């Protein structure tokens, strides 16, 4: 499955002798840690990043530490301040932000009176409705089939860290190979975005609402080859998204590479995109 990404992390850093000095980068929103001793000395800590960060990046930030996603941040913070095994600390860096509180309030408003929200702010209503529908679909869908060889190859590829250049192109000319079904399955997972293509402005506006996601572009058979938006594909992969619809803005997300997968019934047009960017997976 895709690389582990998270904002909230727990860490344990074993040491002997002098307490290791921890120097945080600007990517860290908040951290709390303390010196503990059970069978050995270690630092027990919690980190809140400013954006979703891969396990690989976290290991570079804190070499030698054991790291896990923190699924309950408040409990993790409390755990890093427990008295029973504490020797020194706790120490803090930055300011903790209660993530998701704004989303929770919006969803509470939606749950209480969706019709009122629909009248007051139709756009917000549609986004909340979409979130509710996606949650329902995620709860009742699973992959209960044997993987085809190309699906297995694709999964193994996206288990690796994405680079800043490679675009995955899943090619099946005949139809019925399972491309669309698999694209929809992948994008049921958190951190993935699905589109069937369309106008560049519409695609970029939609993606700009959640611009840290991996991407599946599922091209319908009826779409003519010349209408594929290679510029959109490259913008997303290059991490510079220029949205000109409604509220024009440029979103830069340098260094946060994402997987971009195109599912199509034809091969890429290498006169419109660099051939060395494309990794073709044949169905």
Curated annotation (Swiss-Prot):
Pfam families: RNA_helicase, Viral_Rep. GO terms for molecular function: ATP binding; ATP hydrolysis activity; DNA binding; endonuclease activity; metal ion binding; nucleotidyltransferase activity; RNA binding; RNA helicase activity. Keywords: ATP-binding, Covalent protein-DNA linkage, DNA replication, DNA-binding, Endonuclease, Helicase, Host nucleus, Hydrolase, Metal-binding, Multifunctional enzyme, Nuclease, Nucleotide-binding, Nucleotidyltransferase, Transferase. One of its GO terms (cellular component) is host cell nucleus. Its main location: host cell. Its cofactor is Mg(2+); Mn(2+). A motif (Nuclear localization signal) lies at residues 51-71, 96-102. A motif (RCR-3) lies at residues 79-82. The keyword Mitochondrion does not apply. It catalyses: ATP + H2O = ADP + phosphate + H(+). A motif (RCR-2) lies at residues 42-44. A motif (RCR-1) lies at residues 10-13. GO terms for biological process: DNA replication. Residues 3-96 form the CRESS-DNA virus Rep endonuclease domain. Belongs to the nanoviridea/circoviridae replication-associated protein family. Initiates and terminates the replication only of its own subviral DNA molecule. The closed circular ssDNA genome is first converted to a superhelical dsDNA. Rep binds a specific hairpin at the genome origin of replication. Introduces an endonucleolytic nick within the intergenic region of the genome, thereby initiating the rolling circle replication (RCR). Following cleavage, binds covalently to the 5'-phosphate of DNA as a tyrosyl ester. The cleavage gives rise to a free 3'-OH that serves as a primer for the cellular DNA polymerase. There are 3 rolling circle replication (RCR) motifs. RCR-2 is probably involved in metal coordination. RCR-3 is required for phosphodiester bond cleavage for initiation of RCR. Homooligomer (Potential). Rep binds to repeated DNA motifs (iterons). The genome of nanoviruses is composed of six to eight segments. In addition, some isolates contain subviral DNAs. This is Para-Rep C10. It comes from Milk vetch dwarf C10 alphasatellite (MVDC10A).
């Amino acid at each position: 499955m895709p690389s582990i990404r998270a904002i909230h992390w727990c860490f344990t850093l074993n040491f002997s002798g002098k307490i290791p000095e921890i120097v945080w980068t600007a990517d860290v929103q908040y951290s709390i840690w303390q010196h503990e001793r059970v069978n050995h000395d270690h630092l027990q800590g919690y980190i809140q990043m400013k954006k979703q960060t891969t396990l690989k990046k976290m290991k570079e930030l804190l070499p030698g530490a054991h790291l896990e996603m923190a699924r309950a941040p408040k409990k993790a913070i409390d755990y890093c301040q427990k008295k029973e095994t504490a020797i020194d600390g706790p120490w803090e860096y930055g300011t903790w932000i209660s993530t998701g509180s704004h989303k929770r309030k919006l969803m509470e408003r939606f749950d209480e009176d969706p019709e009122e929200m629909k009248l007051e702010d139709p756009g917000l209503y549609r986004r909340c409705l979409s979130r509710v529908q996606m949650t329902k679909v995620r709860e009742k869908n699973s992959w209960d089939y044997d993987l085809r060889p190309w699906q297995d190859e694709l999964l193994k590829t996206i288990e690796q860290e994405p680079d800043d250049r490679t675009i995955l192109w899943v090619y099946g000319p005949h139809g019925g190979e399972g491309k669309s079904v698999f694209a929809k399955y992948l994008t049921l997972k958190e951190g993935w975005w699905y589109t069937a293509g369309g106008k560049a402005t519409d695609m970029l506006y939609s993606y700009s609402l959640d611009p840290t996601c991996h991407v599946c572009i599922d091209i319908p058979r009826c779409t003519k080859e010349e209408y594929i938006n290679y510029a959109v594909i490259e913008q997303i992969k290059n991490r510079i998204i220029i949205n000109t619809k409604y509220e024009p803005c440029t979103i830069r997300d340098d260094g946060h590479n994402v997987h971009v997968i195109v599912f199509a019934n034809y091969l890429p047009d290498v006169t419109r995109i660099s051939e060395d960017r494309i990794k073709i997976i044949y169905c």
